[in-house]
Amino acid sequence: MGTLYEVLVPKFHLLEIDRTRRHVRCQTYTDSERMYGGPKDRTYGCEKGLGLDNLLLLTDSYKVTHFKQYPPGTKTICSYFESRGGRHVDINFFGLQYFLKRYLCGVVVTTEKIDEAQAIYTAHFPDALFPRDKWEYIVENHGGKLPVEICAVPEGLTLPYKNVLMTVENTDPECFWLTNYLETLLVQVWYPMTVASNSRVQKKVCFDALKATSDCDLTNPFSWMFMLNDLYV
């Protein structure tokens, strides 16, 4: 298993795996250093206003019931993420570090968030389907940190389709259900990956056209790097 690599943005720290307690963690960074944090007052009808900061709510609702559907005796779930294909010959892997540092690092499960999630999921389906005890286990035994290990290829790497880009695996046998609970959040990396992949191809088109039709000094990146107005972001 590899390590998680640092996104090439100033002041973002390398995300590491805590091998002693087997949690996802990262070095301390301030709110002002977060990218795309978004407004903090966005809520979804909850009195306490936790909204998008509540990891328990950042999943497809049907996944809340999956803990009941695994075979008895399941201890470990390891899932992988890949790009199955697209319009180009390869893909640029980019964006995972933001989601890890924004949503998964540090203490992300609290009694307050469990209460909020239970209220919402109880309104959605019978209370017995919400595994409150399993989330409380994470609070009591892991201090609210997620007992999962996430490994990935380096941010910014371009590679062919049908390669494993990241893996997710639980590190506590009692939390085998957590691996795929995180899928909904982690697959949001498709958007920055798509932007990065398309931009890379478009940038190459500009470069090749200049090389074939102009006498620009292409060793100077300023002669061509501003040609692409990328509006994806």
Question: How would you describe each model-predicted region?
Answer:
Residues G2, G37-G38:
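Residue-identity detector for glycine
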Residues L4, L8, F12, C46-K75, ...:
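Buried, small/hydrophobic-residue-enriched core segments of structured protein domains
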Residues K11-H13, R19, V24, T30, ...:
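Intrinsic disorder/low-complexity segments
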Residues I77-F130:
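Low-complexity, highly charged intrinsically disordered N-terminal segments
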Residues V108-V168:
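Glycine-rich, N-terminal phosphate-binding loop and its surrounding beta-alpha-beta segment
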